[in-house]
From Swiss-Prot:
Catalytic activity field: a purine 2'-deoxy-D-ribonucleoside + phosphate = a purine nucleobase + 2-deoxy-alpha-D-ribose 1-phosphate
Gene3D superfamilies: Nucleoside phosphorylase domain
Protein name as catalogued: Purine nucleoside phosphorylase
GO biological process: nucleoside metabolic process
Any one Gene Ontology cellular component term annotated for this protein: cytoplasm
Catalytic activity, EC: 2.4.2.1
Function in brief: The purine nucleoside phosphorylases catalyze the phosphorolytic breakdown of the N-glycosidic bond in the beta-(deoxy)ribonucleoside molecules, with the formation of the corresponding free purine bases and pentose-1-phosphate. Cleaves guanosine, inosine, 2'-deoxyguanosine and 2'-deoxyinosine.
Length: 268
């Protein structure tokens, strides 16, 4: 359901109002966006108070990428009312950035002060393993685009909040941190591009997250970013890359990553 001519903030408020009506909850204080391979983790987050297609909300578009169910769930985790967005849309699907970040803006309008962004990522370090979770410490926005229009000079010094990363690390001390590089996609990177990204300081590479982070920070929310390493990037293993292995890695890790995510959120 799209309303392309409305002010983005007004559209987010309308969608948030519908969420309140559909769930019976006026304020969700945490929101989670589940990326490629993460949707299987929904069951481990807890029982849902309400489940419905995101596309039934004003301004939302059904995701087309495999592994993105396009559902919205309302879940209670500890003391928190949590909005779970199972799947996202991507710029490479042909969508304008205002549509890509609309779910995050809606979550903020629905009361979320913490946004948890998850994704599937290629690991750029040889010591990384498929199935490993990595906390995003910072990002490189190599898409060259921003979801903000106008004089919105948002500070991104602490884009991925140190406080939340510490809470996550306290929950699971084995978690490591890394810099996430966002590429436009949908093609995977070449080995030469991977070598370049490593020289730039990147540890992870993917095709999402950074625009949502910018939108969330502009709305005053804190962000925790978590990448699931679903493959080692081009040129590291010598094997070709494909999306099926991304989904397989997520499915294999579903219960573990879902339970860990719930434990982290309970500490917020």
């Amino acid at each position: 359901m799209t309303y392309t001519l409305l002010d983005p903030d007004e559209l987010a408020r309308r969608a948030a109002q519908v969420i309140g009506e559909r769930t019976g909850i006026l304020k969700h204080d945490v929101a989670v966006v589940l990326g490629s391979g993460w949707s299987s983790a929904v069951a481990a987050l807890g029982s849902s108070r309400a489940v419905f297609p995101q596309a039934e909300l004003p301004g939302f578009i059904t995701p087309n990428a495999a592994g993105h169910t396009g559902e919205l769930l309302s879940v209670r985790i500890g003391a928190h009312r949590v909005l779970v967005l199972a799947g996202r849309i991507h710029p490479y699907e042909g969508h304008d950035l205002r549509h890509v970040v609309h779910p995050v803006r809606t979550a903020c309008a629905a009361g979320a002060r913490i946004i948890v962004l998850t994704n599937a990522a290629g690991g750029l370090r040889a010591d990384m393993a498929v199935g490993q979770l990595v906390l995003i410490s910072d990002h490189l926005n190599l898409t060259t685009r921003s979801p903000l229009v106008g004089t919105h000079f948002v500070d991104l010094t602490n884009a991925y909040t140190t406080r939340l990363r510490k809470l996550a690390s306290d929950t699971d001390p084995t978690l490591t941190e890394g810099v996430y590089a966002a590429q436009p996609g949908p093609h995977y990177e070449t080995p030469a591009e991977i070598r370049m990204l490593r020289m730039l300081g990147a540890d992870l590479v993917g095709m999402s997250t950074v625009h949502e982070t910018i939108a969330a920070r502009a709305a005053g929310a804190e962000v925790l970013g978590v990448s699931l390493v679903t493959n080692l990037a081009a040129g590291i293993t010598g094997k070709p890359l494909n999306h099926a292995e991304v989904l397989a890695a997520g499915t294999a890790s579903a219960n573990r990553i879902g339970s860990l995510l719930a434990d982290i959120i309970a500490r917020f």
